[in-house]
Structure formats: structure tokens, C-alpha cells
Amino acid sequence: MIGSLTARIFAIFWLTLALVLMLVLMLPKLDSRQMTELLDSEQRQGLMIEQHVEAELANDPPNDLMWWRRLFRAIDKWAPPGQRLLLVTTEGRVIGAERSEMQIIRNFIGQADNADHPQKKKYGRVELVGPFSVRDGEDNYQLYLIRPASSSQSDFINLLFDRPLLLLIVTMLVSTPLLLWLAWSLAKPARKLKNAADEVAQGNLRQHPELEAGPQEFLAAGASFNQMVTALERMMTSQQRLLSDISHELRTPLTRLQLGTALLRRRSGESKELERIETEAQRLDSMINDLLVMSRNQQKNALVSETIKANQLWSEVLDNAAFEAEQMGKSLTVNFPPGPWPLYGNPNALESALENIVRNALRYSHTKIEVGFAVDKDGITITVDDDGPGVSPEDREQIFRPFYRTDEARDRESGGTGLGLAIVETAIQQHRGWVKAEDSPLGGLRLVIWLPLYKRS
């Protein structure tokens, strides 16, 4: 097996070219209608018939008035069973031929006229053999044998040889499966590499040993790809560990700050400055909690999955959100509630994902929020619409990044930490789903979540 892709393509090209040239050179010779040499047995049979006909003519005195009759008698007597003999005079007259055969006989006589080198050729269901030289006194005749063809060539084969374009088309059709297989085998490593790259793009950092096989070029690319995946996985693990460690380390001074604030309130009473310190401490505490949640969600091994039904998973989240909306003077409508659709995943992560986008809508809406659920044979689609200020098209892809903030009024004063939607995207992608932002028919932002249904294998 050739290891280099370049050498393999080069070899396939020249092999294909050689096969085409071989076909071009050899196919005409495979046409059974071509002039071919006689076998030794056929040569001996022809010479023996030639001698018998000459002897018969020598024993039959010539008759100037009925000269052709003695020729008929001679060829009829010595014609082999199932075959016929023809005699051609020096003037070109054919003795013993039928009218329907004259065209092919004339064609053969025009190609085979050397008695020292007799040949044979097939014409459909008959075959002509000759010529052999017959002497009759001062006259010379050419003797031909007409017999049934041993294996007549089919009309379709004849059509192929007579029409080169049709032969080319048939050759292309016959060679197409082989060429498709060759193309598939050459492209197979590229498809594997592409699929592995797609998995990495979706956040699935795992090595693919099968990439380190095949042609040398793809083998080297596969090895480099696996090294890259290992480096990315190591970097992501280090980043998540660092994020988790920082969050835990921030807990201690934050706890001390909250304790000091409580002691200061007890001694000095309430004040605007103290209230501001408490507010910022609470926000910092929320941010640390969100960082820890996101760090845990990014580590797939930390997610304990189970089978759960959608209505059991999200009913409480929707009830609580409806109550909060009522307290805020807003309306939350569930157009189509979730049904008993099976999902497989971590209940806490999935519950938190919907809760985050619903709270996001509550936070930024003016008066109205709508939640809808739809299901098909593949998965569940959840839409959350609000009538708030919305998000510009250029910011929609960015709002799922940690700490990303738009230029509008969606800032920290609204109560957010900038991590909610990042947590949502991480959780949904962990469950092989996706989340995206669109314009809402209510005038604000629409967030769409899709999750695959659980199908028992």
C-alpha cells in the first residue's frame, strides 16, 4: 500500500491513463467481426476442399454453353455439411451465392483476395472463409467457404464497436463505481478530520486515534490535531480550575466584609454608605456564585445526568416566574406549557438554564413576557419573548460571552452579573442543544433554546 497521498494520487492517475489507453488499443481487436487468421485445422480443411474441387472439375469435361453447371456440381459435391462453397471467376462473377448474401460477399472479397493468405470474418450469423485458389485448365477461380458463425456477436456489442461515442459512455458508466470508490477512499480521512474538528467546535475536546491512520499527510495532520486537542483540554482544565480557585479564595474576604458590615450596622445604625457597601457585596457574592456554577457546568464529569420529563422539570420555574412577574406589575404568559417529554441530563443545570433566560426577560421587559414550548420527533424548542429594549444584531452573538455587556441600558444597575446567559449556553451545549437570540415579535429580545429528546436505544 502506498503511504503518501501524493504518490497515491499520482499512481491512480497513471493507472487510469494506462487502462484507458489499453482499452483504446485493445477493444478494436476484440471485435469478432474483424479479419482474423485461419487456424491450422481450417487451413488444412480449405486446402483439401480446394484439391477435391480441382479434381472434380478435371473429371467433368467443360461445356461452353453450360459452363457454370459443372462449377455448381463441383462445389455442391464437396461442400462440408451445413456449409456452402462459392467460386469467384476472374471477371468477378460469384457462383453459388444467394442474392441476399451478395453485399457481404462483395465486402469480404474486397478485403480478402490473396489465396496465399486466406482469412475469415464474421458477418452477423454467418462467417466467410477464403480465398483458396482453384485451377481449371487455363482458368483460375477463387474458392470461398460460407458457414454459420460459431458464436455470433450480439447486436448491442456491434452497436458499441460501430459507435465510439456510445462505447465511451458505457466505459464511463462501468468505471464510475471504481472511481467513486477511489474518491471516497481518498476523501475518507479528510471527512474524519472535518467531523473531529466539528466536535471540537462544539466544545467536545476528545482525542481521535482513528485520525492517525491512512496516508502520511493525513496521519501527520491527525497527530497534530490530537496534540492540539490535548493542549486545548489541558488549557481549559487549568482555566476552569483557576476560575474555581479564585472564586473560592474570594469567599473568605467577602465573608469578612459581610461580617464587618453587620457589626458596623449594629454599632452605628443604618446609613447610605453602609447600604451601598451591602449592595455591592451582595452583587459580588452573586457573581462568585455564578462563576462557580459556570465552572462546574463546564466540567462535564461534574454533571450527573438522569431521565426526567419536561413538565416536571420546568413547571415550578414557570410558576415562580409568573408570581414574580405579578409582583413586578408585569404579565408572564405560557402559550403552550411543557408536556411529559423525556429529556436526559442534569436537572439542576436544565432548570437553571430556563430560569436564567426567564429572569433575564423579567429584568428587561416593560410589561409583557411570553414563554412557548414546541416539540417534534427530534427535540424541544423553548422560546422566551419580552417587550424590552432588545439587542442589536451585532450584539446577539456576543451576549452569551461571560461579562459581555451591550451599549444599551442592560448594565450592572439592572441587577445582572453578566454571567447568566453564559451559564445558559454552557448548560445547553453540555446537553447537545443550542441557544440563540433573535428579534421578538413583542418588540424586544427572543431567546430560543433547543434540546434533543431522549430516545431509548
Swiss-Prot record:
SUPFAM superfamilies: ATPase domain of HSP90 chaperone/DNA topoisomerase II/histidine kinase, Homodimeric domain of signal transducing histidine kinase. It is found in: Cell inner membrane. The chain crosses the membrane at residues 8-29, 164-184. SMART domains: HAMP, HATPase_c, HisKA. Residues 185-237 form the HAMP domain. Its cofactor is Mg(2+). The two-component system is activated by envelope stress such as overexpression of some (misfolded) periplasmic proteins. Activated by spheroplasting (which removes the periplasm) in an autoregulatory cpxA-cpxR-dependent fashion. Cpx two-component system is induced at pH 8.0; in a degP deletion mutant induction is halved. The kinase activity is inhibited by periplasmic accessory protein CpxP; proteolysis of CpxP relieves inhibition. ATP binds at residues 248-251, 359-364, 386, 405-406, 416-421. It is a multi-pass membrane protein. Disruption phenotype: Loss of the Cpx envelope stress response. Decreased resistance to the antibiotic amnikacin. Single cpxA and double cpxR-cpxA mutant decrease transcription of degP. Decreased transcription of cpxP. Hypersensitive to alkaline pH (greater than pH 8.8). Decreased numbers of stationary phase cells bind to hydrophobic surfaces. Greatly increased resistance to hydroxyurea, probably due to decreased recognition of mis-folded proteins which eventually leads to decreased OH radical formation. Histidine kinase member of the two-component regulatory system CpxA/CpxR which responds to envelope stress response by activating expression of downstream genes including cpxP, degP, dsbA and ppiA. Activates CpxR by phosphorylation; has autokinase, phosphotransferase and (in the presence of Mg(2+) and/or ATP or ADP) phosphatase activity. The kinase activity is inhibited by periplasmic accessory protein CpxP; proteolysis of CpxP relieves inhibition. This is Sensor histidine kinase CpxA. The lineage of its organism: Bacteria, Pseudomonadati, Pseudomonadota, Gammaproteobacteria, Enterobacterales. The gene is cpxA.
